[in-house]
UniProtKB/Swiss-Prot annotation:
Database matches in InterPro entries: Ribosomal_bS6, Ribosomal_bS6_sf, Ribosomal_S6_plastid/chlpt, Transl_elong_EF1B/ribsomal_bS6
Protein name as annotated: Small ribosomal subunit protein bS6
Highest taxon, organism lineage: Bacteria
Stored HAMAP family: Ribosomal_bS6
Length: 128
């Protein structure tokens, strides 16, 4: 099997405001479980942003409960997450996208760390 590099993704979803708080918490837990089990991802961070006003109405609502989840996966099973969002009526909007900027920062930090280690061990230096 070929090695597939893990990528960093951000998934934002909005839960309808008429859903009770306990049920909203359960929905967030279900999304996390889908990311871990079906998408085979590793969750990095979960941000519950709470109720926010919309710039325009969405499905006759003027506000919603926002949640953002950052996770790593190879991207092959992301459709499982999108399908869950699509068939869950309490989730009124969602968007999942790859975070190239975070991947770039991570690669840069790894290169800098490797360069610092090379200097410490005396590798890759110029000869006098």
């Amino acid at each position: 099997m070929a090695y597939v590099k893990e990528r960093i993704y951000e998934s934002m979803f909005i839960i309808a405001p008429n859903v009770p708080e306990e049920e909203r918490e359960n929905l967030v837990e279900r999304v996390k479980k889908i990311i871990e089990e079906r998408v085979k991802g590793k969750i990095e961070k979960v941000e519950r942003m709470g109720m926010r006003k919309f710039a325009y109405e969405i499905k006759k609502f003027s506000e919603g409960d926002y949640t953002v989840i950052y996770f790593r996966c190879d991207g092959q099973n992301l459709q499982e997450l999108e399908n869950f969002y699509r068939v869950t009526p309490e989730i009124i909007r969602w968007q999942t996208f790859r975070r190239f900027d975070l991947e770039k920062k991570e690669r840069k930090a790894q290169r800098e760390k490797a360069a610092a280690e090379a200097v410490e061990t005396g590798e890759g230096g110029s000869e006098a």
